[in-house]
Amino acid sequence: MNCKLTALLFLGLIVIASCGWINEKKMQQKIDEKIGKNIIGGMAKAVIHKMAKNEFQCVANVDTLGNCKKHCAKTTGEKGYCHGTKCKCGIELSY
């Protein structure tokens, strides 16, 4: 039960961080307060950091909302490709 509650709270933190309601620094401070500076806290902070960096919603090489394509078309005129969680303009996947 405790493990499920922790997972649910963690997913809630990810949603809040990715929606932009509060910033990454505040989220990481809350993790330090609630979980502490240990291995689990470090993993939680790493996931929050990855989610906060993901401004174009690229997940596992898939442009889920089309934001990467729109961004690249607007800025460079090239096609946008998702590389993991990063958006790269005009650079296709090589694998």
UniProtKB/Swiss-Prot annotation:
It comes from the Eukaryota. It is found in: Secreted. The keyword Cytoplasm does not apply. InterPro entries: Long_scorpion_toxin_alpha/beta. It holds the Pfam family Scorpion_toxin_alpha-beta. Disulfide bonds join 58-82, 68-87, 72-89. PROSITE patterns: BSPN_CSAB. Residues 55-95 form the BetaSPN-type CS-alpha/beta domain. Disulfide bonds are critical for antiviral function, and their disruption inhibit viral activity. Coiled coil: none annotated. Keywords: Antibiotic, Antimicrobial, Disulfide bond, Secreted, Signal, Toxin. The keyword Lyase does not apply. Antibacterial peptide. Dose-dependently inhibits Dengue virus (DENV), Zika virus (ZIKV) and Hepatitis C virus (HCV) infections. Two mechanisms of action have been described by two different groups: one involving activity on extracellular particles, and the other regulating the immune system. On Dengue virus (DENV), Zika virus (ZIKV), suppress the established viral infection, similar to the effect of interferon (IFN)-beta. Mechanistically, upregulates the expression of IFN-beta by activating interferon regulatory transcription factor 3 (IRF3) phosphorylation. Belongs to the long chain scorpion toxin family. Class 3 subfamily. This is Scorpine-like peptide Smp76. It comes from Scorpio palmatus.
